[in-house]
Amino acid sequence: AGGNGGDGGLIGNGGAGGAGGVASSGIGGSGGAGGNAMLFGAGGGVVALTGGAGGAGGAGGNAGLLFGAAGVGGAGGFTNGSALGGAGGAGGAGGLFATGGVGGSGGAGSSGGAGGAGGAGGLFGAGGTGGHGGFADSSFGGVGGAGGAGGLFGAGGEGGSGGHSLVAGGDGGAGGNAGMLALGAAGGAGGIGGDGGTLTAGGIGGAGGAGGNAGLLFGSGGSGGAGGFGFADGGQGGPGGNAGTVFGSGGAGGNGGVGQGFAGGIGGAGGTPGLIGNGGNGGNGGASAVTGGNGGIGGTGVLIGNGGNGGSGGIGAGKAGVGGVSGLLLGLDGFNAPASTSPLHTLQQNVLNVVNEPFQTLTGRPLIGNGANGTPGTGADGGAGGWLFGNGGNGGSGATGTNGGDGGDGGAGGIFFGTGGTGGAGGVGTTGTGGDGGAGGAAFLMGSGGNGGSGGAGLTAGGDGGDGGNAGSFFGAAGTGGAGASTKAGGTGGTGGNGGLFANGGAGGSGGLGGDAGTGGAGGNGGLFGAGGTGGAGGSLGPGAGGAGGNGGLFGAGGTGGSGGHGTPAAVPG
């Protein structure tokens, strides 16, 4: 095993942990832990390691009590043989104001190693992003690491994306929960599921990670991660997290992954809001040439707020998800909500529809209500949420064709509160290139930006992921960039959205698997007090470069760059 790094002094950084030893057979040694900082300084990172079966990466060191960055967890060891990839190390804990460290990426192997968990945030800091799951050549891709929990007043960290595999993609990691007393900070977004399979052998996409929950009283739930693409079945979208009990909107469910041969993935369910807030939109079902996935269920309002839209069904006869019912006092039901048996509720809905009509006609958005979802297969944009409050509608998926059509952009969130709509997935290119995913919709004052849509698969080149939407100016999380499609030439991951005043930038989307693998998307820029987002992982086989970390705000740290993809000496398509 590698030795541990030394602890820093009163003003100084912790030392890096040593690399684990290489084993020609058996298991490689574990990496040493990074040293801890004391008052002013950064925790030590950990050197990557290799081995017969990969050893585990060491844990990142903790940040200084007052200032300094938490250490990044070490990468798990990799192998090009039949052994297992090592697990990534956990990120270090943040100091008083610092974000937790990013978890290490899992090592590549016959089964991919799990990504390391993001470190816990300091008292006012957000949790760290979970590590990317490792690539697998003959079994399951590694599971993405869970996002770190926010400090007492901090936001939850984003879950890591699942590893790609030639058989079955790994599941995305769950987003971390926000701190108990967080004043508007959101739960972390779930990680994107890994892509799975080959054109000749089929394969299954990994499920998206669940969004983290907000704090006890205030804040929005994190969005669920999108399911991965599968050459047979697409992965299921992750459910959105729940909001604080008083104020906040439920997180949006993740889109289901495209299933090229059999079935598209089911969209994730939208999260539950607080007393004041909108239910989360359900994710769109994944497209398929055989059976499209059903859309996710929209979250139900409580007192004041709209029900979430039911997710649109995927191309291939997928059914739309059931929409959420509005709050008891004020709000509009989400798309595809069940007919009410209450005369009072029916009257309330009819009156609101009459009030909304002139606003919709003159401005293109209602006074109160969600924007409409874009029609699947058209690439239509989602509608904007209400002038007072409402979620943006999900973008429609792109059309299947010689070259796939681009997915529609998600609609903007409402002015006072509301979540931006999720971008639509790019369409499949039957003989050419796949379509690009749509961008996530932006929030305005209080709300989270929508996640970008995944790029569409294509015979010659995959589509790029859509960019994540920007967070609300005051509260809410930035959207995650969509994943690039896996094919002969993998697509580039989308750029994460920019944070608001206190929010970190969104994570970049992972690059697609391929002989010429896609580059990970860049992390979004942090707000005034926020850190830059983590760059997306590069696609494997090619391999692809990791995405650049986002720029920190005036008082925030820069984001960690994404891990590069794993190359293989074997012949690859493309």
Name each region found by the language model.
Residues 1-574:
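Long, compositionally biased tandem-repeat segments
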